[in-house]
A protein has these predicted regions:
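Canonical P-loop GTPase G-domain recognition
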Residues: 67, 72-76, 82-147
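Conserved beta-strand segments of alpha/beta enzyme cores
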Residues: 11-13, 105
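Switch II of P-loop NTPase G domains
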Residues: 2, 12, 18-68, 87-90
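Nucleotide and nucleotide-moiety/phosphate-recognizing core
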Residues: 6, 60, 73-75
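Conserved nucleotide-binding/hydrolysis micro-motifs of P-loop NTPases
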Residues: 18-21, 51-55, 81-85, 111-116, ...
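Conserved, well-folded catalytic cores of nucleic-acid-processing
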Residues: 4-8, 23, 38-45, 69, ...
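Long, well-ordered amphipathic alpha-helical subdomains in the mid-to-C-terminal portions
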Residues: 138-198
Length: 198
């Protein structure tokens, strides 16, 4: 899924990668291969971390993955959830994340409150190399409304079922009916990786 940000003098294409974790199944391996391909082609990697907690094995794995996959790209660490961080932990937690990617730019951010979001956006645009615009100014995604609906359903399912189904879920849109008003009727099938999750 691509999100397109266009300003007066720049255009950034954001590609959300699958989570980077140790693969156990074919789906995991495919997701990791997809993430690797995206990072290899990236000019800038925006790594969003939860700074309210210390980095663990997963964060170390992601840092290593980024650095080994594309040594030449710039990395920007958005240390999210700074609004949940206890004041006495600001320096220690941010230092731990900066140590994982010493060359990375970084900033504390609260996506919930909007703290530093505009600054990060502008920093990323400044890091991009000169190149052509690939999309018209009014385009914000390469997905159709039908595809976005599937993503929203998957996000909701993962939110409500996150303890039962960590990430192995896909959404197939069976019917997508738009009426003359603002209503859309959607029939979808949720596909899970493991049969015990049905």
């Amino acid at each position: 899924q691509r999100g397109i940000l266009t300003s007066d003098n720049a255009q950034a294409i954001f590609i959300d990668t699958p989570g980077i974790h140790r693969p156990h199944h074919a789906l995991d391996r495919n997701m990791l291969a997809t993430a690797r391909g995206v990072v290899q082609e990236a000019d800038v990697v925006l790594w969003i971390v939860d700074v309210s907690r210390k980095p663990g094995t997963d964060e170390r794995r992601v840092a290593q993955f980024i650095q080994q996959t594309n040594e030449s790209c710039k990395v920007f660490i958005a240390m999210n959830k700074c609004d949940l961080l206890k004041p006495q932990n600001v320096i220690s937690h941010s230092t731990m994340y900066r140590t994982l990617c010493p060359e990375a730019l970084w900033m504390l951010v609260s996506a919930k409150r909007g703290d530093n979001v505009e600054i990060i956006k502008n920093e990323i645009l400044d890091l991009l190399p000169i190149g052509p615009r690939y999309y018209d100014d009014n385009v914000i995604t390469d997905k159709t409304v039908r595809e976005l609906s599937g993503e929203l359903l998957r996000e909701s399912a993962l939110h409500y079922l996150r303890h039962e189904i960590p990430h192995g879920i896909a959404v197939l849109i069976d019917e997508f009916i738009e009426d003359e008003g603002d209503k859309i009727e959607i029939m979808a099938t949720l596909v899970v990786e493991n049969s015990r999750h049905k």
